[in-house]
Structure formats: structure tokens, C-alpha cells
Amino acid sequence: ASAAGAVREDDDETLLNPVLNSLDNLVSGL
């Protein structure tokens, strides 16, 4: 499970989704 996936379950954190998506992309690219 990705950090972004966990945050998507919490609507109050919507603004962080783009940031966490970027982090997930960076981590998956390592």
C-alpha cells in the first residue's frame, strides 16, 4: 500500500494527494 493510497481514504488530506503521488513515483523509480 502506498502513502498516497492511505491518504486518499481521508478526504481531509486531499491537498496532499499530488505530493504523495509524486513521492510514490520517485520511490517506485529507485
Swiss-Prot record:
Keyword Secreted: yes
Tissue distribution of the protein: Expressed by the skin dorsal glands.
PTM-bearing positions, type Leucine amide: 30
UniProt-annotated location(s): Secreted
GO BP annotations listed: defense response
Predominant location: secreted
Keyword terms, alphabetized: Amidation, Amphibian defense peptide, Secreted
GO cellular component, one term: extracellular region
Family statement: Belongs to the frog skin active peptide (FSAP) family. Rothein subfamily.
Job description of the protein: Lacks antimicrobial activity. Does not inhibit the formation of NO by neuronal nitric oxide.
Name the UniProt record assigns to this protein: Rothein 3.4
Source species of the chain: Litoria rothii (Roth's tree frog)
